[in-house]
Structure formats: C-alpha cells, structure tokens
Amino acid sequence: MQAKTTSEEYVIPNFAQTINNRTIVNIFESCKYRSPLIICALNDAVLAKEYSNSMAMGSGTITFMIDNDVDIMSSLYTTFRTVSTLLLMGNQLCVFIVVPMSVISTDALTAIAYAYRGAMIELRHYGRGDDYVQERLESLFKLSPLCGTPHMGPKYYGPTVFSELLDLSHHNKTSWYSVIDYSMFTRTALVGFASYMMKTLSLNSSIVNIVGYNPPYVWAAMMHGVTIRYIEKEIPNPKGKGPMGLIMPELNGRVLTNKVKYVLHNPQIKLLCLDSMMFMSSRNIVYIGAYPATHLLDMNLRGWNIYAVDPEITQQWISDMKAKTGANICASSRKFMFDVSENIKINEFFGNQPYSIIDDSWVPDNYEQFQDKKRNYFQELVKSDQKVTLITMKWNTRKNVTCEKLLALLPQPYGGKLYEMRAFFHRNGIGSITIDANSVEKYIQKFQELPLGAQVGTQKFMHTMISRVQDVMSIQPKKGDVIIASYSLSNASNPKKKVLEYLTKASKSEAMIIFGAPNLERVKYMRERGVLPGNNITINGEKITFNNPSGKKWTDFGYTNSELLACDMIEVTIEQMVSFMSTSFRGTGYYSNSIYNDLFSWFIPIWVWNQTMQIQDIRLSPVALVKCFTTKIRNLCYVPHSTYYALRGHLVAKMFSENNIENNCYSISGKSNETFTVLKDFKFPTSIGVLEFKAGEKVNISGHLLSLAVAAHFVAVPVTMWARHIKYMTVDRQKPPDVDRILFFDNKIKRNTLEKWHTKSEVILAALIAGEYVGLMLNNFHSKAIVDDLCNTVLATFR
C-alpha cells in the first residue's frame, strides 16, 4: 500500500515482518520497567554536566539538562516530549534541572516526575560545593542504571529483613514481590488521593472507609492525616476469649493462615503498628510514656490532639513534635498519677470530647505494683461516665490477674523476644476474667516461634477493633462519604449487577468513592497473547480467577470502561492521582511495576472530575502513554517518521474513498502536523452527525487518540477523561488562576490563554480509522473489543 506525501512515495512496511506474538509479549514485559526516569534538581550546572556525562558513558543513561539560560517552557516541552518516546526503550533516563525554585517549584517538578512515572531528587536546598550533593550524585552514578530513590513516591518499605528475602528467593516468590511492591504503592496512593480530595472538595468527613482489609491502609492514613475504618463482610473468628475473641486469639487459626502478605513497615519500630491503630480509634489521644515517640515524627497528625505525659519530655521535644507532625500537643513532664485528678485536665484539653489512651509507661522498681495500679485505673475509667473510646496498656505481669472490661490481650507484631503483650480495655469488654500467668507465658513463647511474617500478620487482630462487619452495598451512600473499594468490590462474591447499581447510587449521591477492578478486555487480550503476569489466570465469561505463587486463589469479575461510565464513574490512573497530589503524596513508591497490576483500572465519580479536573495540565495528561508504545513498535519495524504519518493519511483517504468522497475535495499531506488539506467544501456523514470541511482548511487528525488505542492493550488508559479534556479544548481556554503555569508546558500557551488542541472533526476522523490503524500497527495481533470500547467512548463524548 502507498501514500503520497510530497514528490516522493514511501512504501508502508509490512508489519508482519517483525510484529508477531513474541513481540507483543516483549512489549508487555517491557512495561514492568517503564519507570526509568529520574529528575534531579540542583544548583550546580558544572556538577550536573559532570555526572550527566559519567552516567551516560558508564551505564548508557540518556541524560538531559535544563538550565536557567533557556526558555523554560520550551525546554521542558522538548525535553519531556523526547522522554515520552523513550519510556519503553529500557535505558535509564535522567533529567538534570539547574533552575531556581523561584522559577520551577519542587511541587511542580514532582508533579512532572510523577506524570512520567519517575523518581524525584530535590537537591536545591543545598548550596554549590555542599558535600551532600556530591555524595548523592556519586551514589546516583554508582547505582545506575538502578535508582536509589523510589518511583512515584517518597517512601519505600520493601523486604528489609534478610530472612524475609531468603524465604522469598527459596520459594520462587521474588518476581511476585514486585506485585506486592506496586500494590503497596497503589493502596497508599488511594488513601493519599482520598485525603487530598477531602481537602480540595471541602468534604465534611475525616473518615475514609476501606472496603476489604489490608494492613498498609492504616499506615497510609497516618501519613496523610485521615482516619480509616475497614468495612468487611465477615471477619474470621480469632478463637480467643472475650466478646470479640481477641483475648489471646489462636496463633495457628484461619486468621493467620489466610494473612494478607504485604510490604513490611520498618521492623525496628515496634510501636508503629499499635500506635497507628490507636490513632485511628480517636482524634484525641492521651499518650502516657510518650517520650521519645520518634516513630510519630514522620506522620501527618494535623487534626489530632495529643495529651502527652512523660518525665523525659522537654520543651524542645514539644516544639519538634508540633512542627513535624502538625498535632496540637499539651505535654507534661511530671509523672502520670493514674487517679481522678488527671481526668479533669484531660477533659478540659479535649473539650469534653471522647478520647483514647495509649500507655507505654514503665518504672524500674515495684513494676508489678505499678501495673496493678494502672490496670485498676483503666478498668474503672471505662466503667465510669468518662468519654473513653479505647485504652491500651503494656502487659508484662507474671502473676495471675483478674480484671474487668478487657476487650483484647494481644501479642506485639514487632515485639521480638520481649515478654510483653498489649491489653485493650473498652466499655464492651468482658465483665470479669482471670488471666493465667502460665498460659500467657506459653502464648508468648508460641508467638516468638512464629516466622516474622506471621508475627507481623497478628496486627490483623488489632485492626478488627477499627473494622465494621457489614456488606458495604447494604449501606446507603451519603453526600460527603469517602469510600475506597479497590481489590475488593470486584470480588466474584459480589454480583456484578449489584455492584454497578451501588456505584451508580454512590456517584449520584455525591459520595467520593474510588473503585478498582480488573479490566476485562485487557485481561482477555493478555491471556490470548500468552503473557504470564507472575500468577496463573483463567477466564470464564466475565469471571477471572487468579492463582499466585504462594497458593492463594481468588476470583474477580472483570469490568469495562463503558460499564463504569454508565454508572457516572470515570477512569483515572493511579499515576494521575499521584501526579495530581504531587508533594502532598506521602506514601510509598516502587522500583518495578508488574504486568498483574496493569490489568486493573480505577474509577472516580464524574462529579469529582467536574469540580477538580476539567482542564488538563501535565498532571492529568496521558503523555507518558501516547508516544512510547508507538515509538517502540516503529523502532522494532524500522518505520521512518514520514512513513508513520503517511499511514494516517492513507487510512483517511481510504475511508473517504469508501464513503464516496471525491478525491479532488482534498489533498493528503501525511505529515506530523497535517494529515490533509481541504481543496473544496465537502461533507462527511458519520454515526454521530455530519462533519463539514471548508476549502483551505488544514486538518491534522488526533495522533494522541491513535496512540492511546495502541497503549490500551497493555496498560490502563483514561480515555473518557482524555476525551472530555479534548472536547473542552476544541476552543481556546483561559488558564485556571490557581494552577502553576509551568504545569501547562505541554500545551500551547500565550500569556494566559491555552490554545485549542484539535477540532471535533479531527478527533472523530481519528476514532473512525483507529481500528484499522491499530490492526496495522500490531499486525492484527490486537483486540477489536479494546479498540471499539475506546473509540465508542470518544464518539459518545462528542455526540
């Protein structure tokens, strides 16, 4: 087939020469490492140039440098348009930014890095010649092509314990760990996004409801200043004593054998799990034995009130804790008396609002007597009319003890070899119970014999105290409710029709709900191509069954974009969420992605999009998707740049011919900035109306749409959002006053006017040829269902 471009003719290569099923599988595999970008901002251009050369020569890193001597917007555009073509090529990419913060803020640069799934290194707080900058760049050079900074997030809690790593490698689980790694990122991103939107939309809620249990949500909530509640259909019986079975629950029961595996928190911080759960129980915390509480310094505790007591407390400690956590703190360096006099001060500080107590106090002498005094005080407190939500205290006693209102007696997930448990008192605790010292000793010994993963898994017992046992779909969603239903509602135990009805109700009631599910057509395509995502997958109709290497098996319903759109839900990728938050995201990043995670898509209500995301800047742009897949295929097939664009012109001409449009009405240009020129007026009928073309008009069909149709076979593509954005930009628009101008570097912007992208006709024509275009690009190894779903969504948007 041929297409005339200028005075020469270019033969369109036969994609069958190189594109076969193995090629498709290789593209899937390359998606695992499609985050090779690092943005490094510093003040020293000489040093940046030196390490740019060293990394390029030493590891094949493709480097770029932007300094303050160039037009910043233009330089950002050319640099990152280049980056977008290279994201699947396998080379590390590093962009050195030597521009003052007054020109490009850390927030803007972080948003750009995350938009391209990159890592952000900010060194502009250090002056030229600072030793730390030299050390950091030397580390970057030595680690290349790896990166010592996680992608898409500032934190990382991977398998840091040697025994854990050894266990993974012995059981052939290391490849599956990238799935867990990325899942941890996903869960913390969802909590961060919910928190960000709660503030942005001024929602009258401080609670995020989590459908489906997984431990990292608690830590993520602490990092983003929100409170969570789990909503579970059922919770396995812990088989201990007490009303919830949490007084010394079984250590070999279904709770632990079915434990959720996840990336560990820092195992050196034994109080992190306990304190995180207690901070979820109340926004008012009495912390007895608070000093030093270093594990809290990294948390976002704005909105929490802490009444801290410890003889070691200093004014400096109070200042640091307030400054770093944002909490409102009342601190006392005297001993806590464990008597009624304390209650008056506590109630005054909390304004007579409910509160929880964390006790981590200890004395060197008469410790048994000290424990008796605390225990008696706490059990009387929960029996009184005081507004006490929950109390936890150390349990080190080595004698038989009878107590009241005990709700739970649990091991400490990171307790190590300590002879110590945690008691929890609550108004609904058991009336009276005698705890046998010998039984406690045997229980602790059994706990210490468990592998680390199982020990950490016991925090599930604690989390049942912040869980609600109910089918979320039986709860009427209300305006302002915040719900995360990812990896949960899509489970096959939830009828698909019922889930779609619930999502419709939630969206229409203006609840802020985030829904995640496998994309049915993408899963089917992956299976047809024989791709192995690290676990076995079988498909039966709309049901998808997963088997992971550890033997866990689960079945989900697959969903499509069209189904969710009918529920007033719009797709947003996790990367868009994180880029939109920028530096407000304080969760975990990752080092490699997984094919398994790319099977999922996430959706938010359209009303949220309408209020916050109606105009596209780099944070919401699909720019990291539109170039890299087609560029990789073009390089595999040695397709010249001019030939690639000639193909588009050829397909448009073919379509016009099939629809009886005379060829003297237009002239095919087949260039990157012009598909054809209109020679005389003509009309072209389509399923959504008649397109009119005027003589002299230069038409450039949407390449973004065509590229997205290819990318949608491999990764989540937010086509509905993109279609709405491009429809909005069929005319010039004013830049939103509250959005940094830098974030529009990928737009054409003059003063504060954003120039239009494409006409309606240019988008519709691209949608109409997309099926044949993708078929040629992938040599008919494509999914008609994926392309049809994408194009029908675009056409419906412009209808």
From Swiss-Prot:
It is found in: Virion; Host cytoplasm. Keywords: GTP-binding, Host cytoplasm, mRNA capping, mRNA processing, Nucleotide-binding, Nucleotidyltransferase, RNA-binding, Transferase, Virion. One of its GO terms (molecular function) is GTP binding. InterPro entries: P5_Phytoreov. The keyword RNA-binding applies. Its EC number is 2.7.7.50. Transmembrane segments: none annotated. GO terms for cellular component: host cell cytoplasm; virion component. One of its GO terms (biological process) is 7-methylguanosine mRNA capping. It catalyses: a 5'-end diphospho-ribonucleoside in mRNA + GTP + H(+) = a 5'-end (5'-triphosphoguanosine)-ribonucleoside in mRNA + diphosphate. Pathway: mRNA processing; mRNA capping. It comes from the Viruses. Belongs to the phytoreovirus protein P5 family. Enzyme involved in mRNA capping (Potential). Binds to GTP and might have guanylyltransferase activity. Together with the RNA-directed RNA polymerase P1 and protein P7, forms an transcriptional complex positioned near the channels situated at each of the five-fold vertices of the core. This is Putative mRNA-capping enzyme P5. It comes from Rice gall dwarf virus.
